[in-house]
Amino acid sequence: MKIPKGVTIAGVFVKIIREDLRDEDHHPKGYFGYYSHERRVIAIDKGLTPAAARDTIRHEMIHAALAMSGLDHLEHFEEEAVVRCMEEIFFPAYERFLRNLNRKKT
């Protein structure tokens, strides 16, 4: 999967970069990516598989949307719960929509 250079969220361009997100012993730090609102950057770990990279970018896009909506004042664990809930609701519905749309085209 080719990673896009960025994505526009709420009219704001957010750059997507790959970083080594492992510690000095090359162990995962416990996360696959992050969103920096100050830098307008989504960073994902260099070692992710294409599917994991896609899922991580989608996850961080939700964090970015929350921040741009002024909803980034939550505690980390609260924001993470909101993001995961939104992932479970929105993305399956969107993927079903795309499948149905593709069926109608054929």
Locations of the language-model features?
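Metalloprotease/metallohydrolase-associated module, dominated by Zn2+-dependent proteases
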Residues: M1-A52, M68-T106
